[in-house]
Amino acid sequence: MTRLKNDTLLRALLRQPTEYTPVWLMRQAGRYLSEYNQTRARAGNFLALCKNPDFATEVTMQPLARFPLDAAILFSDILTIPDAMGLGLYFAEGEGPRFERPLREEWEIRALTVPDPAVHLRYVMDAVSQIRKTLDNRVPLIGFSGSPFTLACYMVEGAGGTDFRQIKTMLYRRPDLLHHILDINAQAVTAYLNAQIESGAQAVMIFDTWGGALSHAAYQQFSLRYMTQVLAGLRRYQGAERIPSIVFTKGGGLWLESIADSGCDAVGLDWTVNIGDARRRVGHKVALQGNLDPAVLFAEPGVIAAEVEQILASFGEGSGHIFNLGHGISQFTPPENALTLVEAVHSLSRRFHRADAEGNNSFGS
């Protein structure tokens, strides 16, 4: 296999020496870019954008044409799996994703089956293959999925941004039904991510967007348990290439030790966590990704650079840090501020990697 021209991200995920801190942005292909909006208009709607490999490739590549990012991430949606299960995904204008047939009845839940990614999600695999070819080994491609619990939230509630009344009622009244959904979802996520890896993804990420809405005990039982199941089933190698995995629970700072023990290679942090404290807690086990408040990108360039330096200094010297936002980039972000961020990370981080550059890595892999 041809070597990557820039494998800094993969080395950082495995806590191997790097010359600088790599950076990519959650939702880096998105509405803050005018070219994305133009492509979306040509596609007709968001789902058509996701389901057409040509469009998905085009928008995946757009931020890399603007910014010297260290990774591409597959352009898709976290709800492709429940859509493939037949729940009828659609997007209401101004309201986000919705399902025509949310899971409310026991017979519907018992009838759930694991979709075959090669059949029901072929368009995603075609996009992964096409993006890899288009990247031409420039930077690695990250594949992703929603976590079993986050998918279940949408599947039961029928929409996002709710008070979680439906799924929490099920959790406490009929935990057996929720466990059934989560087990099916975990099998589906495992198959989906493995298919992405086989199609060319060089790292994978699990987005646990709603895990932070749970109590401590419920998080362990209904979210982390099933992400651990997924991680245990993932391909760790594709040929001779190691495939790192990232887990991100928004609001999961209280559970870093548990997440670090799940089998992932890196833990994503939201902006409420001090990354230096996080490193002291789990940095001997996993790499850390994050964790700038996305709202910082509304500030002046000097403020952005200062906030970047604060996070870099908090993490400290050595490898094992992937710079990112603490959540997805806002659609209102000025693109030039994203460039300021990326350039600041690259320039300011080098002094924290001098020992790495000299071949000395105290943290190992």
UniProtKB/Swiss-Prot annotation:
UniProt record, GO biological process: protoporphyrinogen IX biosynthetic process from glutamate
Pfam family, one: URO-D
GO molecular function: uroporphyrinogen decarboxylase activity
Keywords: Cytoplasm, Decarboxylase, Lyase, Porphyrin biosynthesis
Marked site: Transition state stabilizer: D77
GO cellular component: cytosol
Pathway(s) annotated for this protein in UniProt: Porphyrin-containing compound metabolism; protoporphyrin-IX biosynthesis; coproporphyrinogen-III from 5-aminolevulinate: step 4/4
Binding site for substrate: R27, Q28, A29, G30, R31, D77, Y154, T209, H327
Top-level class of the enzyme under EC nomenclature: lyase
Protein location: Cytoplasm
Function: Catalyzes the decarboxylation of four acetate groups of uroporphyrinogen-III to yield coproporphyrinogen-III.
Family, similarity comment: Belongs to the uroporphyrinogen decarboxylase family.
Subunit architecture: Homodimer.
Name of the protein described by the UniProt record: Uroporphyrinogen decarboxylase
Gene that encodes the chain: hemE
